[in-house]
């Protein structure tokens, strides 16, 4: 298993390098999206990626809500979800998502969609404004100018996993479908992350979370099926072994008991002494006593041991051979008489 996992990690790294080298680096670093994904057992995943700036009709088509920033103060820290108010983050038994759209060059307005964060309370609005414009914007700018921008960065920050996507501009339609919808076809722009990495966290998206859950569920069912098959085969083998042992000890070295079989009594001491006194001639005349341990009554009394009746004598006319044909005459000499 460790070897297979190491091979998958190497394939993942090679595939990320391949798709990155085939794409051009985005020059626009101002318009970004930030996603928040929460789930059961305290699962929290965030993602930052580039976005095309020419999106329109956010309210009707994509159901985004505009919001104004309420603070301009910067907050020091590592800029994780710990900078947000914990009571503002909604958690449940199923996955909850929120997507924020913002232009880092214009820190007056941002758009949000989803139910993973509560935007109805003023305190929540204040913390999310600083989190987005002073935290996520700075992280994205540092990431784009970083020398290792051609790979996906996965950061583990306590109970949070943050995914820094490749510095490309994703369309809003693909972003909403990947981060805010649990079902549907994988968008073509995010297909590169799924082809060879179906069981790895690379984008922190909602569809990726469901793909991971399905993969783990299938692996669990496969392991349970293997355990069930192994247990069933083990039970069958143990049952056959017990049956063979019972037949061996019950039937006296015979694995298949004949019908009406009964064990003969064991030898007594007197019979043992008599057996020792037998001579070679006695053994020729009678059946040795020791063979009683192997022979069974049904063999002696079976009809297969009775000789068939002798055939009647052959009639005399069948015994006599027919007379041989007479020998063929010898060659004749021809005499020719000539007149004088």
UniProtKB/Swiss-Prot annotation:
Disulfide bonds: none
Protein's cellular compartments: Host endoplasmic reticulum membrane
UniProt topological domain (Cytoplasmic) ranges: 247-340
Positions in the Lumenal compartment: 26-225
Residues carrying sugar: 27, 54, 57, 68, 72, 78, 83, 107, 118, 146, 173, 180
Manganese keyword on record: no
Name listed for the protein in its UniProt record: Uncharacterized protein UL20
């Amino acid at each position: 298993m460790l070897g297979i996992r190491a091979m998958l990690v190497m394939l993942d790294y090679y595939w990320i390098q391949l798709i990155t080298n085939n794409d051009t680096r985005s020059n626009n670093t101002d318009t970004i999206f930030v996603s928040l994904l929460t789930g059961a057992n305290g699962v929290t995943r965030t993602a930052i990626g580039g976005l095309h700036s020419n999106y329109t009709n956010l309210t009707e088509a994509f159901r985004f809500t505009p919001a104004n920033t309420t603070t301009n103060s910067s907050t020091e820290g590592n800029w994780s979800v710990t900078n947000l108010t914990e009571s503002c983050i909604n958690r449940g038994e199923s996955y909850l998502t929120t997507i924020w759209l913002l232009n880092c060059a214009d820190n007056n307005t941002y758009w949000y969609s989803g139910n993973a964060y509560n935007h109805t309370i003023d305190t929540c609005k204040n913390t999310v404004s600083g989190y987005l414009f002073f935290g996520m914007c700075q992280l994205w700018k540092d990431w784009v100018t970083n020398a290792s921008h051609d790979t996906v960065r996965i950061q583990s920050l306590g109970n949070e996993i943050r995914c820094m996507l490749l510095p490309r501009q994703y369309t809003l339609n693909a972003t909403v479908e990947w981060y805010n919808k649990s079902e549907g076809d994988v968008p073509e722009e995010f297909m590169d992350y799924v082809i060879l990495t179906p069981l790895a966290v690379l984008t922190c998206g909602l569809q990726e979370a469901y793909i991971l859950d399905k993969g783990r569920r299938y692996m669990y069912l496969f392991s349970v099926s293997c355990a069930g098959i192994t247990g069933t085969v083990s039970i069958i083998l143990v049952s056959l072994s017990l049956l063979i042992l019972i037949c061996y000890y019950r039937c006296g070295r015979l694995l298949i008991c004949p019908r009406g079989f009964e064990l003969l009594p064991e030898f007594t001491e007197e019979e043992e002494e008599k057996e020792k006194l037998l001579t070679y001639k006695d053994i020729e005349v009678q059946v040795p006593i020791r063979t009683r341990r192997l022979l069974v009554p049904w063999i002696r009394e079976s009809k297969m041991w009775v000789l068939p009746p002798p055939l009647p004598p052959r009639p005399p006319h069948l015994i006599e051979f027919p007379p041989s044909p007479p020998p063929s005459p010898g060659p004749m000499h021809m005499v020719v008489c000539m007149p004088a």
